[in-house]
């Protein structure tokens, strides 16, 4: 089959105008949001998976076109870039989404939409010349949407009588002249009225901006997947080890506190606890005031009596040897006083084993 010929797919009935070009866009195919689509749109592989691997698929140079034209069967005529058809202020690769019902059948509502359409139509032929045959079928689908004189003008290309010219800039210029003719869409205007006036400066897609934003969001997601960028959930995943590390630090701190509490010697606490207990109970306070010299060593004999061997207790608390001998002498002195005051030395022996609690006297 010649390079310019393409078989007609479906009946030769004007489906929509050229303004409904987005019906053939892969985004429209993805969410099925476009009414009035009467065929399965084709998908260009370079749109979804850029061959160059870059986010912006740049036009191939004339040398690349000439080398790739050998596989296509003919050398294309050199032409300039289509930058004149598309304003430089607008992004090159963000495809404009035609929404059905917005300015149908004409480009008169905003002239730059026609330039955008022509630039996109030319990009199918110029971005990657190795996809020339696939782009021809796509261009034929776009041309089939033209009505009136535009459809009659595109009929030879659709029938395959005329091949699509390699000089695609000339083709776009001819198409622009046909589309700008006010009589080009007479058949379409007879059926559907244009929702916007011809001289309106408002963009025909203004009511459809939320839909366009959704398409742009999906386009950015597709670019992120193609480029292999890391998902946004990575910062949250990186934050989880930090939380677990803080938990481990807090657990280790608690464990160290428990160790320090267990390792602290017992005799350090009694000087604090007896003062509080003695202040609450008036019984032990009187002998302490009457005998100031014996008030300090009074808790020591009770501890030594509760722990029967006196040599085992001083080892962790007091490693020195002379202190156990002093406590034994004081024990003998205090036992006589306690027998006189309390009268029941056995109850003193049966006091709680905790080093900080003083003996409870039943008389008081």
From Swiss-Prot:
One of its GO terms (cellular component) is mitochondrion. Keywords: Apoptosis, Mitochondrion. GO terms for biological process: mitochondrial outer membrane permeabilization; regulation of mitochondrial membrane potential. Residues 311-322, 355-364 have a biased composition (Pro residues). A motif (BH3) lies at residues 114-128. The BH3 motif is required for pro-apoptotic activity and for interaction with pro-survival Bcl-2 family members. The lineage of its organism: Eukaryota, Metazoa, Chordata, Craniata, Vertebrata. InterPro entries: DUF4939. Ubiquitously expressed. Changing residue 120 to A: No effect on interaction with VDAC1. Its main location: mitochondrion. This is Protein Bop. Residues 66-88, 258-364 are annotated as: Disordered. The keyword Mitochondrion applies. Could induce apoptosis in a BH3 domain-dependent manner. The direct interaction network of Bcl-2 family members may play a key role in modulation RTL10/BOP intrinsic apoptotic signaling activity. It is found in: Mitochondrion. Interacts (via BH3 domain) with VDAC1. Interacts with pro-survival Bcl-2 family members, BCL2, BCL2L1 isoform Bcl-X(L), MCL1, BCL2A1 and BCL2L2. Interacts with BAX and BAK1.
């Amino acid at each position: 089959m010649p390079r310019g010929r393409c078989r007609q797919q479906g009946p030769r009935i004007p489906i929509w105008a050229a303004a409904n070009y987005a019906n053939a866009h892969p985004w429209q195919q993805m969410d099925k949001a476009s009414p009035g689509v009467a065929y399965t749109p084709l998908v260009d592989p370079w749109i979804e998976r850029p061959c160059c691997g870059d986010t912006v698929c740049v036009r191939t140079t004339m040398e690349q076109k000439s080398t790739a034209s050998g596989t296509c069967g003919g050398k294309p005529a050199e032409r300039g870039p289509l930058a004149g058809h598309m304003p430089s202020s607008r992004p090159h690769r963000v495809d404009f989404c035609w929404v059905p019902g917005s300015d149908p059948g004409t480009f008169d509502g905003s002239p730059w939409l026609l330039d955008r359409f022509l630039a996109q139509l030319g990009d199918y032929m110029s971005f990657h010349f190795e996809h020339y045959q696939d782009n021809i079928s796509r261009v034929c689908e776009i041309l089939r949407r033209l009505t009136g004189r535009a459809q009659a003008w595109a009929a030879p290309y659709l029938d395959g009588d005329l091949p699509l010219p390699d000089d695609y800039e000339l083709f776009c210029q001819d198409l622009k002249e046909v589309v700008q003719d006010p009589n080009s869409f007479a058949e379409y205007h007879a059926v559907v009225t244009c929702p916007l006036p011809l001289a309106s400066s408002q963009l025909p897609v203004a009511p459809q901006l939320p839909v366009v934003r959704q398409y742009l969001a999906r386009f950015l997601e597709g670019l992120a997947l193609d480029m292999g960028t890391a998902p946004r959930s990575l910062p949250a995943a990186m934050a989880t080890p930090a939380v677990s590390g803080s938990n481990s630090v807090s657990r280790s701190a608690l464990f160290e506190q428990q160790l320090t509490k267990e390792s602290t010697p017992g005799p350090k606490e009694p000087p604090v606890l007896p003062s509080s207990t003695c202040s609450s109970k008036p019984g032990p306070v009187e002998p302490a005031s009457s005998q100031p010299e014996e008030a300090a060593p009074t808790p020591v004999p009770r501890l030594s009596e509760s722990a029967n061997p006196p040599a085992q207790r001083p080892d962790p608390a007091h490693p020195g040897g002379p202190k156990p001998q002093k406590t034994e002498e004081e024990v003998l002195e205090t036992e006589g006083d306690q027998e006189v005051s309390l009268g029941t030395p056995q109850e003193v022996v049966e006091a709680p084993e905790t080093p900080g609690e003083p003996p409870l006297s039943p008389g008081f």
